[in-house]
Design a protein with these regions (language model features):
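Surface-exposed, interaction-prone regions used to assemble/regulate multi-protein complexes
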Residues: 1-182
Length: 182
């Protein structure tokens, strides 16, 4: 990985999927977005772990998020893990290849009527297995998170409400997470 883009410690954690998930803060994406903005942050990486957990690595804009970022000059790395992703869609263009600069992010629960329609469509079209449908029903509450880039790219995830977050300084030290709005 390019040292200019990825500090060595981050490249190691991404390539070896070795983030310390024992020290996470659990929250919902809606609660996180009530405290921070992802606007102008750099979206470094996305990968999928066993069990269809999605991990996003974001270089969080410290200018927009002074309090959350411990008033650091250097932008810290926010690592998000969505444990149960039931469906995903992504569409990016050539401008998004190097760094994906985030324009906006939003997350909201799917109402039960929309969820039921989505499940029916997923089963009828063969996009959702009966196992996946069963997991969604067992979860009882499902959220849709959309992250868009300034160049028109988009990631959309249908997932269980609880996400896990980690925050690291640019040098790789783990930072505490404060979910109290400034």
């Amino acid at each position: 990985m390019d040292e200019e883009k990825y500090p060595a410690w981050l490249a190691d954690k991404v390539l070896n999927t070795s983030f310390d998930w024992k020290t996470v803060t659990k929250t919902s994406m809606s609660e996180l977005l009530a405290v921070i903005t992802l606007h102008d942050s750099y979206w470094y990486n996305t990968y999928v772990e066993d069990g269809n957990a999605w991990v996003l690595v974001i270089n969080l804009d410290a200018v927009w998020n002074k309090t959350f970022c411990h008033n650091l000059e250097d932008w810290p790395f926010l690592v998000l893990r969505f444990q149960q992703v039931f469906c995903s869609f992504q569409d990016f263009n050539d401008y998004d290849n190097d760094h994906r600069i985030i324009g906006d992010a939003e997350s909201a629960p799917l109402n039960s009527g929309r969820l039921f329609e989505w499940l029916q469509f997923g089963q009828a079209s063969g996009l959702l297995s009966s196992d996946a449908t069963k997991k969604v029903v067992e979860t009882k509450s499902v959220c849709r998170t959309e992250i868009s880039t300034v160049y028109g790219g988009l990631l959309s995830l249908i997932h269980a409400p609880v996400i896990e977050i980690l925050l690291y300084s640019e040098q790789g030290s783990q930072l505490s997470i404060n979910l109290v709005a400034p």
